[in-house]
Amino acid sequence: MTEIRNNWTKEEISAIYNSPILDLMYRGATVHREFHDPQEVQVCTLLSIKTGGCPEDCSYCPQAARYHTDVKVEKLMDVKDVLNSALEAKESGSTRFCMGAAWREVRDNKDFDKVIDMVKGVSTMGMEVCCTLGMLTPEQADKLKDAGLYAYNHNLDTSAEHYDKVITTRTYDDRLETLDNVRNAKISVCSGGIIGMGESHGDRVGMLHTLANMVEHPESVPVNALVPVEGTPLEDQPRVSVWEMVRMIATARIIMPKAMVRLSAGRVRMNTEEQALCFLAGANSIFAGDKLLTTPNPEVNADKEMFQVLNLKPRQSFKNGDAPKIKFEQIPSALVK
């Protein structure tokens, strides 16, 4: 039985990450089968509920106000429109619905009240509800938990050492503090990062080291390949190869056996064969839908065809934890189509 550890050294993780690729894939696949059904893949939908105009300077992000990209600033969506999108996601097979807002941090205002209503509404649909809204205070995390939030995404993005080369408007410790607030509120932690931002292999190991040595491993670990966007500082970064993704996914699977390892951004550039390598290495979650916030993603029909070819089946909701025990009144009919 593989031991669940929170005391990994960078040297140990580096040895795993740098092992021969076929050996690494085999080990990742073996651990994956020990803890998960290898034919099960979690299908998630990510919706941008507030787009563009972000005051931060994340070098990869087309939603930063300071960069000249094609992203148009949009205000926070209406609650009924978000709930309709959630219903459509459920009908298409998603079991987790994540709402993302281009904010630096959550503020205690009417917009946050609307997000609380969105969380309450989606939680009545039988899906895992996730948000990614920026930095959170302990009190805000508690409010989201009380509303029925299942998971909160707040990525580390990269290693502590490389972080300042990518972002300067918030610190690495700011990110870790938000994750602590989420965990203390008994909300599942979703945290991973992006590769292809000019970091070294040592930086990738460093990020995995931080994730694997948290008090509890994240419930979900998104592994993103940079999708360079014209107008951002990282627009000319070379494409991340499938083998780089396989190394990250297999290593994450080995050192965080129970986590959902999500094959996230960059999947649109992969064919079915390349995605199959990632699933074999230990990935067991994807984002479905034509967009990931503002970047392209494979079409729903293409994913359905891939599931058929690879004999994959959607994972049911709440297999990693209990559904919210709070009961809400039925969604008012005026809020949904």
Swiss-Prot record:
<dbReference type="InterPro" id="IPR013785">
    <property type="entry name" value="Aldolase_TIM"/>
</dbReference>
<dbReference type="GO" id="GO:0009102">
    <property type="term" value="P:biotin biosynthetic process"/>
</dbReference>
<dbReference type="InterPro" id="IPR006638">
    <property type="entry name" value="Elp3/MiaA/NifB-like_rSAM"/>
</dbReference>
<keyword id="KW-0808">Transferase</keyword>
<comment type="similarity">
    <text>Belongs to the radical SAM superfamily. Biotin synthase family.</text>
</comment>
<feature type="domain" description="Radical SAM core">
    <location>
        <begin position="39"/>
        <end position="267"/>
    </location>
</feature>
<dbReference type="GO" id="GO:0051539">
    <property type="term" value="F:4 iron, 4 sulfur cluster binding"/>
</dbReference>
<feature type="binding site">
    <location>
        <position position="262"/>
    </location>
    <ligand>
        <name>[2Fe-2S] cluster</name>
    </ligand>
</feature>
<comment type="pathway">
    <text>Cofactor biosynthesis; biotin biosynthesis; biotin from 7,8-diaminononanoate: step 2/2.</text>
</comment>
<keyword id="KW-0408">Iron</keyword>
<dbReference type="InterPro" id="IPR010722">
    <property type="entry name" value="BATS_dom"/>
</dbReference>
<dbReference type="InterPro" id="IPR024177">
    <property type="entry name" value="Biotin_synthase"/>
</dbReference>
<keyword id="KW-0004">4Fe-4S</keyword>
<keyword id="KW-0949">S-adenosyl-L-methionine</keyword>
<feature type="binding site">
    <location>
        <position position="58"/>
    </location>
    <ligand>
        <name>[4Fe-4S] cluster</name>
    </ligand>
</feature>
<keyword id="KW-0001">2Fe-2S</keyword>
<comment type="function">
    <text>Catalyzes the conversion of dethiobiotin (DTB) to biotin by the insertion of a sulfur atom into dethiobiotin via a radical-based mechanism.</text>
</comment>
<dbReference type="GO" id="GO:0005506">
    <property type="term" value="F:iron ion binding"/>
</dbReference>
<feature type="binding site">
    <location>
        <position position="61"/>
    </location>
    <ligand>
        <name>[4Fe-4S] cluster</name>
    </ligand>
</feature>
<feature type="binding site">
    <location>
        <position position="130"/>
    </location>
    <ligand>
        <name>[2Fe-2S] cluster</name>
    </ligand>
</feature>
<feature type="binding site">
    <location>
        <position position="54"/>
    </location>
    <ligand>
        <name>[4Fe-4S] cluster</name>
    </ligand>
</feature>
<dbReference type="Pfam" id="PF04055">
    <property type="entry name" value="Radical_SAM"/>
</dbReference>
<dbReference type="Pfam" id="PF06968">
    <property type="entry name" value="BATS"/>
</dbReference>
<dbReference type="InterPro" id="IPR002684">
    <property type="entry name" value="Biotin_synth/BioAB"/>
</dbReference>
<keyword id="KW-0479">Metal-binding</keyword>
<feature type="binding site">
    <location>
        <position position="98"/>
    </location>
    <ligand>
        <name>[2Fe-2S] cluster</name>
    </ligand>
</feature>
<comment type="subunit">
    <text>Homodimer.</text>
</comment>
<protein>
    <recommendedName>
        <fullName>Biotin synthase</fullName>
        <ecNumber>2.8.1.6</ecNumber>
    </recommendedName>
</protein>
<keyword id="KW-0093">Biotin biosynthesis</keyword>
<feature type="binding site">
    <location>
        <position position="190"/>
    </location>
    <ligand>
        <name>[2Fe-2S] cluster</name>
    </ligand>
</feature>
<keyword id="KW-0411">Iron-sulfur</keyword>
<dbReference type="InterPro" id="IPR007197">
    <property type="entry name" value="rSAM"/>
</dbReference>
<dbReference type="GO" id="GO:0004076">
    <property type="term" value="F:biotin synthase activity"/>
</dbReference>
<dbReference type="GO" id="GO:0051537">
    <property type="term" value="F:2 iron, 2 sulfur cluster binding"/>
</dbReference>
